[in-house]
Curated annotation (Swiss-Prot):
Keyword terms of this UniProt record: DNA-binding, Transcription, Transcription regulation
Pfam families: Pribosyltran (PF00156)
CDD domains: PRTases_typeI
Domain of life: Archaea
Origin species: Halorubrum lacusprofundi (strain ATCC 49239 / DSM 5036 / JCM 8891 / ACAM 34)
Record protein name field: Transcriptional regulator GfcR
Lineage: Archaea, Methanobacteriati, Methanobacteriota, Stenosarchaea group, Halobacteria
SUPFAM superfamilies, alphabetized: PRTase-like
Gene name in the database record: gfcR
Length: 211
């Protein structure tokens, strides 16, 4: 995808397949607000582009499909992510992937670090509009349980930090202790979230120039 029109078309296609706006945000690696805007644009419910640019918060789309579609490349990326975590805690025996895209990354990271694997489905996957606090996430029972264990948390992109913060809270509610988080790309440049160190292969900083 090279431009906004491509993203709008992709958002429309995903919406037609029944994905919620939160799931569309996850698929396109943008914020929930951006996903909602793209879907509205696809439906013809939009303002002039210039007006939209001045009234909405800009976002950055990240396409890492060149890694995701090739198992060897994905393994190499996960190896680098695992290396960032390697010195964080010798007692860590569980890696939690945030669904959807964080799960395959976490699988490869867990393999590198020889830990068990868990997955967490965030609340945004159920979100279409309104207050996301009315939705709830959950851990898959098909994978390892938290059970008061120290954990690493893995995702692909940090856009606002909301999903990572939710995942950290959910782990703590289960009695677990998040030791560190790692992502491919961090759009916000976090050093930590709620006291948990955050590591990324790439930090993205948006620079706005005022003429």
């Amino acid at each position: 995808m090279k431009n906004v029109d491509d993203l709008i078309d992709s958002a429309a296609e995903l919406a037609e397949h029944g994905l919620s706006k939160g799931e569309i945000a996850d698929e396109l690696n943008v914020s929930r607000e951006t996903a909602s805007w793209l879907v509205e644009r696809a439906g013809g419910n939009h303002t002039d582009t210039e007006t939209a640019a001045t009234t909405s918060t800009a976002d950055i789309h990240v396409d890492w499909s060149a890694l995701g579609r090739d198992s060897t490349r994905l393994r190499y990326a996960a190896s680098a992510m695992a290396d960032l975590l390697a010195k964080q805690g010798e007692e860590v025996d569980l890696t939690v992937g945030i669904e959807k895209a964080g799960a395959p990354l976490a699988t490869a990271v867990a393999n590198q670090l020889d830990t068990d694997l868990g997955t967490y489905a965030p609340a945004k996957h159920q979100w279409d509009e309104g207050d996301i606090d009315e939705q709830g996430g959950g851990f898959s029972r098909n994978f390892a349980a938290i059970r008061n264990r120290d954990c690493y948390v893995v995702d692909d992109i940090i856009t606002s930090g909301t999903t990572m913060r939710e995942s950290i809270d959910a782990i703590r509610e289960q009695g677990g202790e998040p030791i560190a988080c790692v992502v491919l790309v961090d759009k916000r440049g976090y050093d930590e979230i709620d006291g948990v160190p955050v590591y990324s292969l790439v930090d993205v900083v948006r620079v706005d120039r005022e003429e």
